[in-house]
């Protein structure tokens, strides 16, 4: 994994964290410039995630012989354990300590749909969000993984074209009334941006440098700042792709940085568990009449330490053991390495 991309993935996760800080503690109301920035533009961390996901999946499967079902099994082992754990924790809080997450309502049927990545209206009535609200992005991720798995039926050089055509076809189907509105979101095309960056990287089209990539990042951030997400693919998706490309170009300045690499490893757990921690912090703040700044300052290290433990125990050890177990069950074929 490119360390520059790992660093960007960590940064994107924490941008989303502070976006939700503004939501949970301040209902997106802010007086300061930084507060408004996180409230109004912090969601762009998701766009960066999607571009990185397309890049990582493309690079991690190049030159490998793998069956569609094996690819999906790898992704399930990577995504599901931590997601199910934090979804169940959120469900328990909603069911038995609803005052911690008062905008939500518990519904078993909705929980089951959430666990299997099926978009459904949240019982709280605020949109197509799963029980663990941040899991809406994983519904898109699993959809992308499914399309990518199907792409293994064609030759490697045709996979990108296959996925583009499949997405275009699906977009046409998504206009039908029987199709969920969830899949009409243009954000799914940001995975394609990531795959295109993977092609460019493998072919040596992304030249290493420092000043030009920094200028690209600055221009991209200004674009994101000046435009909202009404045309998300253009206003946030394309600048996010340019930011990822610029970080790849600066890889020599990140290479061998173990701390940044580890922060990137922990980013998935940061993303999954941060809303639970923030909600608990908000509850304590309101009950004990504490200053929001004090509680937020306490929540940040709690999220960081919990994410580190989650990565080490669930994403790393549990997934590796599951990989070995499944590999033994599968016989000599084994599993391709997880990414």
What are these regions (language model features)?
Residues 1-7, 11-14, 18-38, 58-70, ...:
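Alpha-helical transmembrane segments in multi-pass integral membrane proteins
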Residues 24, 34-44, 52, 58, ...:
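Membrane-interface helix-loop-helix regions
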Residues 49:
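Structured binding elements
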Residues 73:
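Phosphate-coordinating loops and pocket residues in cytosolic domains that bind phosphorylated ligands
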Residues 76:
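Active-site helix-to-loop segments that bind/position phosphate- or nucleotide-bearing substrates
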């Amino acid at each position: 994994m490119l360390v520059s991309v790992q660093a960007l993935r960590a940064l994107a996760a924490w941008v989303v964290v502070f976006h939700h800080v503004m939501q949970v503690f301040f209902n997106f109301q802010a007086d300061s410039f930084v507060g408004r920035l996180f409230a109004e533009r912090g969601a762009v961390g998701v766009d960066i995630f999607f571009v990185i996901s397309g890049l990582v999946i493309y690079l991690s499967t190049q030159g490998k012989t793998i069956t569609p079902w094996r690819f999906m099994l790898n992704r399930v082992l990577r995504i599901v354990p931590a997601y199910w754990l934090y979804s169940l924790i959120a469900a328990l809080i909603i069911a038995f300590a609803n005052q911690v997450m008062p905008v939500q309502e518990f519904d078993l049927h909705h929980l089951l749909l959430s666990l299997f990545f099926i978009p459904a209206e949240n019982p709280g009535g605020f949109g197509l969000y799963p029980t663990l609200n941040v899991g809406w992005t994983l519904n898109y991720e699993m959809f992308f993984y499914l399309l990518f798995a199907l792409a293994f039926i064609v030759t490697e050089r045709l996979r990108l074209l296959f996925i583009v055509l499949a997405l275009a076809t699906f977009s046409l189907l998504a206009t039908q009334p029987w199709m969920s509105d969830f899949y009409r979101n243009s954000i799914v095309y940001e995975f394609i941006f990531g795959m295109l960056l993977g092609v460019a990287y493998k072919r040596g089209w992304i030249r290493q440098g420092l000043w030009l990539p920094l200028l690209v990042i600055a221009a991209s951030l200004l674009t994101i700042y000046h435009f909202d997400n009404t045309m998300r693919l253009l206003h946030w998706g394309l600048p996010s792709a340019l930011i990822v490309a610029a970080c790849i170009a600066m890889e020599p300045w990140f290479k061998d940085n173990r701390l940044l690499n580890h922060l990137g490893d922990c980013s998935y757990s940061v993303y999954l568990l941060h809303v639970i921690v923030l909600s608990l912090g908000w509850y304590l703040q309101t009950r004990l009449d504490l200053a929001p700044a004090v509680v937020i300052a306490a929540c940040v290290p709690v999220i960081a330490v919990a994410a580190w433990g989650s990565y080490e125990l669930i994403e790393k050890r549990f997934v590796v053991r599951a990989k070995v177990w499944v590999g033994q069950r599968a016989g000599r074929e084994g599993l391709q390495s997880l990414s």
